[in-house]
């Protein structure tokens, strides 16, 4: 009764969903980039991830997120996060989202293409 599975969410509603959440829990075993993680970070939501290589080194446990490996880790972290027993990593997480902003990454990619093109 304390968990909501809303399905696919579009547009401005997604920002409200992330922002209104106590926690963004992403226990995926496999991931390529983690766009949903970046969305949650950009909305200043506390993050709990599975500790998998896809999030290294940009997501750092106890710095800009929390990471767990086992179900018991997740249970412990969820309880501590929702009861405010752990320091917030939200502001550091938000910095990660800003560093990976699409406009910034697009500009960097353009510069790389232009450099390669000039060779």
Give short role names for the model-derived ranges.
Residues 1-9:
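Nucleotide-activated donor-binding/catalytic signature segment of Leloir-type glycosyltransferases, i.e.
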Residues 46-49:
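Short hydrophobic beta-strand element within catalytic cores of glycosyltransferases
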Residues 29:
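Aromatic "clamp/platform" in nucleotide-sugar-dependent glycosyltransferases that forms part
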Residues 8-9, 16-21:
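Short alpha-helical donor nucleotide-sugar binding micro-motif in glycosyltransferases
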Residues 87-115:
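A charged, aromatic-enriched C-terminal amphipathic alpha-helix characteristic of glycosyltransferases
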């Amino acid at each position: 009764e304390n968990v909501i599975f809303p399905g696919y969410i579009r547009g401005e509603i997604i920002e409200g969903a992330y922002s209104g959440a106590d926690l963004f829990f992403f226990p995926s075993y496999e991931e390529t980039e983690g766009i949903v993680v970046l969305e949650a970070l950009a909305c200043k939501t506390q993050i709990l991830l599975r500790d998998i290589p896809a999030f290294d080194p940009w997501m750092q446990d106890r710095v800009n997120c929390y990471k767990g490996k086992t179900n018991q880790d997740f249970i412990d972290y969820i309880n501590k996060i929702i009861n405010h027993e752990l320091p917030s990593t939200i502001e550091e997480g938000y910095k990660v989202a800003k560093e990976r902003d699409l406009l910034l990454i697009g500009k960097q990619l353009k510069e790389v293409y232009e450099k390669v093109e000039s060779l």
